[in-house]
From Swiss-Prot:
Keywords: Acetylation, ATP-binding, Ligase, Magnesium, Metal-binding, Nucleotide-binding. Belongs to the ATP-dependent AMP-binding enzyme family. The lineage of its organism: Bacteria, Pseudomonadati, Campylobacterota, Epsilonproteobacteria, Campylobacterales. Its cofactor is Mg(2+). CoA binds at R197, K198, G199, K200, T317, S533. Mg(2+) binds at H549, V552. One of its GO terms (cellular component) is cytosol. This is Acetyl-coenzyme A synthetase. One of its GO terms (molecular function) is AMP binding. Acetylated. Deacetylation by the SIR2-homolog deacetylase activates the enzyme. The keyword Acetylation applies. It catalyses: acetate + ATP + CoA = acetyl-CoA + AMP + diphosphate.
Amino acid sequence: MQLDNDSEFAKKIFNPNRAFAKQARIKNMCEYKDLVHEANEDYEHFWGELAKQKLTWFKPFDKVLNSDNAPFFKWFENGKINVSYNCIDRHLKDKKNKVAIIFEGEMGDYNVITYRKLHSEVNKTANLLKNEFNVKKGDRVIIYMPMIVESVYMMLACTRIGAIHSIVFAGFSPEALRDRINDAQAKLVITADGTFRKGKPYMLKPALDKALENNACPSVEKALIVIRNAKEIDYVRGRDFVYNEMVNYQSDKCEPEMMDSEDPLFLLYTSGSTGKPKGVQHSSAGYLLWAQMTMEWVFDIRDNDNFWCTADIGWITGHTYVVYGPLACGATTLILEGTMSYPDYGRWWRMIEEYRVDKFYTSPTAIRMLHAKGENEPSKYNLESLKVLGTVGEPINPTAWKWFYEKIGNSKCSIVDTWWQTETGGHIISPLPGATPIRASCATLPLPGIHAEVLNEDGTKTKPGEQGFLCITKPWPSMVRNIWGDEKRYIDSYFSQIKLNGEYVYLSGDGAIVDENGYITIIGRTDDIVNVSGHRIGTAEVESAISKHEMVAECAVVGIPDTIKGEGLFAFVVLCDGAKCNLGESLELLKEMNHILSVEIGKIAKLDNVMYVPGLPKTRSGKIMRRLLKSIAKKESITQDLSTLEDVNVVKEIMSIVQMEE
């Protein structure tokens, strides 16, 4: 066994690139600390000034923060604003011919949308929604769409007329779609006939038909269909209408609706512990302000930058860093249809080269997969345009971080390892690329104005090196405002467990460790923490250690009941290059992985079971379905919805291995 040097690598400090830092918005740690001090000195003044300077208001707000009905906080009270106006109209004077969106379809089609073109298309779409479908301010519109430019038109058209959009990821099942439609009581559903994935048509309209059959969603009056792959689909007379046939008859002038700062902008449903999805409700002004500020601070976005976030718009990352953040800044955002692996694993690197991408934001899962499937693929492309790299969605292990830093960033790009959630609206903890010394797999410090702390259950601060609960102890503008239609669930979910100075604080649900320098490392969900003989061990920490073995391409660890220890560790391991091992080799490999764990974490962290599998079950957003793996490890029947999986055959292959081992 050749245990790599990642343990030492993880301790290494990387300072920002000097040339980049000189021109960055926040150039050094002194400037960062000045901003933090400014926010701490006068919290409301800090946020109020940012809102005045960065957003365009129809009517100024008269109160920065209203905490009278905490935790239902109100920001920028009585201000009037429109998000669509801030993302498009205000840029037209100086940037009407600037590219707003670059789109690349999976079949090789290509589209460039200027801000002037975006303005025209959004206005026509907004008029279509108003005039033909009677969509009004406050109505909910479900968007069940793939990654195409029309999806952005739909989002911004809704915001222009004051409708509340709720995007449902295009990989969700008809049942999941139905649940979200009914919870939101949506008036209109927008979808596409289909899209393209891995070179083949992938149909969406049949899922909508199934969701709506037998009047299962009585609030829905009409459905609007965008033709993308032009395959034969069934239409329901009187309900289904074709966007492409109607939109060009509409005027390209549509005055933006004056919205209150606190008017809901969108709902985005997340998984809930009860099984019922939670409709996370975000406001207009506060959300947009933080989307713009984090683009400026975390990505140091510049006028000529081409920004590429690989997330789907069905997730919060796609909302904030594909659409609203880049467009609020007047930047150019890239949209990609399809997968990273079609036609080959060089697709992303070719795009970075071809479109001269400056700032690149993706998930650790994608990085690990690209590393495993095409470790040397990036060397075939010119990636010199890159200035900042970012990761999102889960903790990134040092092995993946190192490859990303060295091979993609050429050891010159800061990696902004961002921590945030659907509920936070935007980044909460992150390095600043021109200022923050970074460490592999460390989210580093809270952003200015954000009070993130690691606390014990009794509200006391943890000591350096101790694991605790990551909390946010003061309200911030982009925070979740409510769970749609369920105030009690909002309080129970986020403001009912940990108190500081007698007041409940926002509980993120993530575990974290803070070091003596204040740097925060995310351990993972607190429900992804395994209690082994009284010792709380984060599965992400175990996965990071196992991944250091030279034969391990990827792994996922879950806790299983153990009569002696309470819980044991069960690992699903994907070997590099599809390698296989016999019984003797597998026992030796288990021994070697446990040696790494004893060195990295301690002898208490020991794998009890290992299953070598061809792949891990992942959603189309790249998230590993750990609950599913836990059911398999515990030999329970699978009850999870598999419709969101990238490849359901992976589960079948794992189950066949289980049957062989029984």
